[in-house]
Amino acid sequence: MEFSVKSGSPEKQRSACIVVGVFEPRRLSPIAEQLDKISDGYISALLRRGELEGKPGQTLLLHHVPNVLSERILLIGCGKERELDERQYKQVIQKTINTLNDTGSMEAVCFLTELHVKGRNNYWKVRQAVETAKETLYSFDQLKTNKSEPRRPLRKMVFNVPTRRELTSGERAIQHGLAIAAGIKAAKDLGNMPPNICNAAYLASQARQLADSYSKNVITRVIGEQQMKELGMHSYLAVGQGSQNESLMSVIEYKGNASEDARPIVLVGKGLTFDSGGISIKPSEGMDEMKYDMCGAAAVYGVMRMVAELQLPVNVIGVLAGCENMPGGRAYRPGDVLTTMSGQTVEVLNTDAEGRLVLCDVLTYVERFEPEAVIDVATLTGACVIALGHHITGLMANHNPLAHELIAASEQSGDRAWRLPLGDEYQEQLESNFADMANIGGRPGGAITAGCFLSRFTRKYNWAHLDIAGTAWRSGKAKGATGRPVALLAQFLLNRAGFNGEE
């Protein structure tokens, strides 16, 4: 699908369709008023007859409006004008894309980007429109033999901006939006792949392909079990012992800043390509969704793709911690004591708390990069789902400025996160009689004690932890990976690179 920006009046558009907004109660947006004036009150007459109230999600498709060059005008209900916020704006864009696609409009000029969204500029509105459009049209049908496609799918979308001065920021918004959307799609595709295809070797192959596609700035190294053993990553290795698939750690290095003192930002993604729970096996109901336990790695992969596509002037390292947690004769057990790469020992009380056992060794491994900051992304705890539900990602950090940066990026991108505490009193729940710590701390504050566990391996750098257990995928009829938190991390890195979205 092709996107572009232009600045022009609606009466001069020869597009197949013009999209304009209508507010409650039957109030035309400024652009719709212009079209109404040109058409000698044709549109307002329809509204007076009760054809459209302007409620969110309502649509009315008009054909051959008098004195208008475009074949059709699509009126979209936007709710009450003063209540048009970020969430409602994206819902309006989503409804627009679906309606255009369903009605066979192959191209359209959209004036919704001229609507006032409180606290948001034209760059934000255009970029969010691009990201929302790509999200709306996403489907995962690679494994289906009968692929359903619209007869006349939407192919071209033009977003209008008020003045020519805003064309440059609009074009940049499209560039950024397309790169972020491509990263989200890549993460979703990986997450939706079945575990018999997407194992650690598959993740490694995708990481290598990324380096091949962006060979100027990207290098990928894959570390196998033998090298992990030599490095002392016994905790990581223990988790994968029960699986016939080899554990593989893929390290993707992007260099966008050649300065010697430019330290990298490291992103670590939990990549459990299937989590049965191991010996502490999960209930069978919903176990198929444990293919999504690698969504942290998928998100990191998507972010690395975005960074490489935009050639951001920052150094970023992405680590995909690929592994599979299966029961078997060689599987690790409750009661085992593992020696981590850091030298600290861990008593295993539950083999289904495996993500932290993989991550702790990776968090030690990345010390060698002398990072500016480390952010791990993991579907880590069901407790985070209980705490925050499926709308907001859990955030913990040992460095307040880093946490504030991530929260700000989450608000900018609409990919929201909420900070949880890492108090010393929670650390006491991890005490063990037989090792330096246990791998679980009981039910109270489970998301926080998991973060506390990881914090013991991050004392040498600034670190943040994103628990995406509630936000990485949807269940039910709309089951599928969401691609979160690619947008959040993309915004964080854009901000670091100086592209903060200000016009």
From Swiss-Prot:
Mn(2+) 2 binds at residues 270, 275, 293, 354. It comes from the Bacteria. One of its GO terms (molecular function) is manganese ion binding. It catalyses: Release of an N-terminal amino acid, Xaa-|-Yaa-, in which Xaa is preferably Leu, but may be other amino acids including Pro although not Arg or Lys, and Yaa may be Pro. Amino acid amides and methyl esters are also readily hydrolyzed, but rates on arylamides are exceedingly low; Release of an N-terminal amino acid, preferentially leucine, but not glutamic or aspartic acids. Keywords: Aminopeptidase, Cytoplasm, Hydrolase, Manganese, Metal-binding, Protease. GO terms for cellular component: cytoplasm. Its EC number is 3.4.11.1, 3.4.11.10. It is found in: Cytoplasm. PROSITE patterns: CYTOSOL_AP (PS00631). Binds 2 manganese ions per subunit. The active site is at 282, 356. One of its GO terms (biological process) is proteolysis. Its cofactor is Mn(2+). Mn(2+) 1 binds at residues 275, 352, 354. InterPro entries: Leucine_aapep/pepB (IPR011356), Macro_dom-like (IPR043472), Peptidase_M17_C (IPR000819), Peptidase_M17_leu_NH2_pept (IPR023042), Peptidase_M17_N (IPR008283). HAMAP family: Cytosol_peptidase_M17. PANTHER family: CYTOSOL AMINOPEPTIDASE, LEUCINE AMINOPEPTIDASE-RELATED. Presumably involved in the processing and regular turnover of intracellular proteins. Catalyzes the removal of unsubstituted N-terminal amino acids from various peptides. Belongs to the peptidase M17 family. This is Probable cytosol aminopeptidase. It comes from Shigella dysenteriae serotype 1 (strain Sd197).
